[in-house]
Amino acid sequence: MRSQRLAGHLSAAARTIHALSLPIILFWVALTIVVNVVAPQLQSVARTHSVALGPHDAPSLIAMKRIGKDFQQFDSDTTAMVLLEGQEKLGDEAHRFYDVLVTKLSQDTTHVQHIENFWGDPLTAAGSQSADGKAAYVQLNLTGDQGGSQANESVAAVQRIVDSVPPPPGIKAYVTGPGPLGADRVVYGDRSLHTITGISIAVIAIMLFIAYRSLSAALIMLLTVGLELLAVRGIISTFAVNDLMGLSTFTVNVLVALTIAASTDYIIFLVGRYQEARATGQNREAAYYTMFGGTAHVVLASGLTVAGAMYCLGFTRLPYFNTLASPCAIGLVTVMLASLTLAPAIIAVASRFGLFDPKRATTKRRWRRIGTVVVRWPGPVLAATLLIALIGLLALPKYQTNYNERYYIPSAAPSNIGYLASDRHFPQARMEPEVLMVEADHDLRNPTDMLILDRIAKTVFHTPGIARVQSITRPLGAPIDHSSIPFQLGMQSTMTIENLQNLKDRVADLSTLTDQLQRMIDITQRTQELTRQLTDATHDMNAHTRQMRDNANELRDRIADFDDFWRPLRSFTYWERHCFDIPICWSMRSLLNSMDNVDKLTEDLANLTDDTERMDTTQRQLLAQLDPTIATMQTVKDLAQTLTSAFSGLVTQMEDMTRNATVMGRTFDAANNDDSFYLPPEAFQNPDFQRGLKLFLSPDGTCARFVITHRGDPASAEGISHIDPIMQAADEAVKGTPLQAASIYLAGTSSTYKDIHEGTLYDVMIAVVASLCLIFIIMLGITRSVVASAVIVGTVALSLGSAFGLSVLIWQHILHMPLHWLVLPMAIIVMLAVGSDYNLLLIARFQEEIGAGLKTGMIRAMAGTGRVVTIAGLVFAFTMGSMVASDLRVVGQIGTTIMIGLLFDTLVVRSYMTPALATLLGRWFWWPRRVDRLARQPQVLGPRRTTALSAERAALLQ
């Protein structure tokens, strides 16, 4: 009953399409014209409505935007580098050119949010200049998230600014980095789309002409495919230009390739069944109904499978994948509808003129032989196909992916040229650093937190695979000069060293003092001897003076007696007026007057005697003081000698100690040893250090960032493996410190690809499970057999693994080009979507032919579908393979991997593996359906295999 109802619906649809073939064709032509007029070309829309490909909920993107917010610098994840390269060392001209560039870039606030001007600051200039001095760079944070149209516009604006400033002779400027790399990917992806489309059309035209040997048939089929492609492009452009969906380079390339391949496949299904019916003797109209009844449900199921599988990508989180969901699903539904309406209408019109009539008798002998071999020896055939599949499966364990986009865009791309220039002077990872931020709840601008920040930098730096860490405590990647405790201790002895010679001079003065004291002692002892002699002389003189005094007193007494007797005579000399004139008188007067001085003389002698007595006493006392004076001086001399000896040894020890401390400090400083970092409080007042604080600490001082450079390629599996150890090292560094509650963020190339890697695993799992479930449900609805549906799904899964393994073998081991990380998920998703088509067509035909018996039905099914499916599979495969002409190597890898999968599915799985499995399972292949009931059902989905029936009866049986 179900088959009869389906046949009735298909017959009604076939009659309607046949009757309204011209209006249907005109409707599709009008629709194509309208959607292509109201919306720009797909490539233009993709450029202006390109979505950011980074996962918005990824920790790395959250971290990048948090860093920009806390430092009040940017709110996007797009970074670019402007690289200066000179033939000689960069000098003043290069700096002036650089300053002009930075000034112009800073004026473009629309596209440039922040400039990390390291080279413009002498404090950090060495950190952004190459070791040979011939290259330097400035990092820019641009508007828009990476991969989005706004970010690409920002990159273009930066490139225009750089191009507008003429460089000095011998100096070149390059715009490179992750942002420009993503922009170049869009440019070259769009540029290659016309090439891919042209090659696809050429391949399809050649294969169609070879298959059908009819130029008119091939041209009509190509026109149908072209009309469907234009319709899909216009519809998707209309949706995108009205912001109903986002696009990306990969979306456009995959969409165009799938549209061309699917529309070609479906029209091959239709034309193949039409020609088969004509070959059995049916007239053109009957062949049309046979074609529609035998393929419409297959096209419908295939279209729903492919579109549904692509729409399952909407459950994924990565924009790389979820941007494929709506465009590809809508595009493939459009192809399916066109293949069920436009293509039959064109065939109906063209068949009236015999344009699709077979030009030669088609032979099924080859496919009958293959079918016979399969049903006769299903076990060996299955074993042989498994061995072929094993070739690819064995290559899977050696699979190595690569995340570096540089290797998958043309080397002539501007960003790639910049990367190559950077590689000539810098380590490979310099253009793609990681940024670690520690966010605390207090101001970090103090010596205590500086110790912890340096501990974080040191711990991260000592993580395997890390080449350099720049932070406030090591702005050039090494600890700040003279910041080790041994050096600072050595510097504390600098004053001692400076005073050491003075100390030596004073010790020499002490020695001189000792000598002078000895000399003074000698002089004093000599003085003592002289004083003793003087004392003796004074004592004798005192005795003589007393004797002289006594004699003078006696003389005075005698003269007094004389004066008493001669007083009258004396008076006479005074009375005589003319005494002066009388010599004897005057002489007597003078003599008598002189005797008056004897009294005075005796008084003076008495006084002199008193003085000599005092002098004699004092002299003896002075002599008595010289002995203790000499003893004291001797003691002072002995003390001076002791001090000289002691200080001489002390100075020697101090010299040795300061020399060792200085050597130790210089050694630690020269070795850049970071085991004993310390910044004294006065360092925070240093103007240079304050500039460093502005670079590495947020304006409020609560956040500190670290610029981390990998030792190898950050966009690799090895680079990704560094992320967890970096986070663990930072977490361990703050454990037990005042910053143990701080939040730690990490952003950059490796952390982004780590998030993409983890997101890819999740997304692929979701997409694969959802697609397999969807395929199984659709296959179950068509075949109504759990086992048959499971076989189709199982062979698709096996085909995926083997095809991808063969791609690994070809690209990685033969061409020595590791597969891009995007190849695996993209290829799996697309091959899941299209891999069941040919098995579905075979099983559907087997279901029609099962009335002749299981084995005979299989032979007939293979004979009836072999040629058509092979042509369709080859066309689909080579259409996807034409993506290898893309300038983006990743697109070529995706296309060739899908091509290998389709070739394997067409030539091995559909031709041998699935028939062998169906034969081995026998009746169980159709479980839970019963084969006897299936055989008794009227075969309404295909023509009767007899020429005895009239064409009209055969048409009614379809």
UniProtKB/Swiss-Prot annotation:
Keywords annotated in UniProt: Cell membrane, Membrane, Transmembrane, Transmembrane helix, Transport
One Pfam family this sequence matches: MMPL
Compartments, as annotated in UniProt: Cell membrane
Protein's membrane topology: Multi-pass membrane protein
GO cellular component, one term: peptidoglycan-based cell wall
Gene name as annotated: mmpL1
SUPFAM superfamilies the record matches: Multidrug efflux transporter AcrB transmembrane domain
UniProt-recorded name of the protein: Probable transport protein MmpL1
Keyword Transmembrane helix in record: yes
NCBIfam families in the cross-refs: actII
Lineage top rank: taxon: Bacteria
Family that this chain belongs to: Belongs to the resistance-nodulation-cell division (RND) (TC 2.A.6) family. MmpL subfamily.
Predominant localisation class: membrane
Membrane-crossing segments per the record: 19-39, 192-212, 216-236, 252-272, 295-315, 329-349, 377-397, 762-782, 791-811, 814-834, 868-888, 906-927
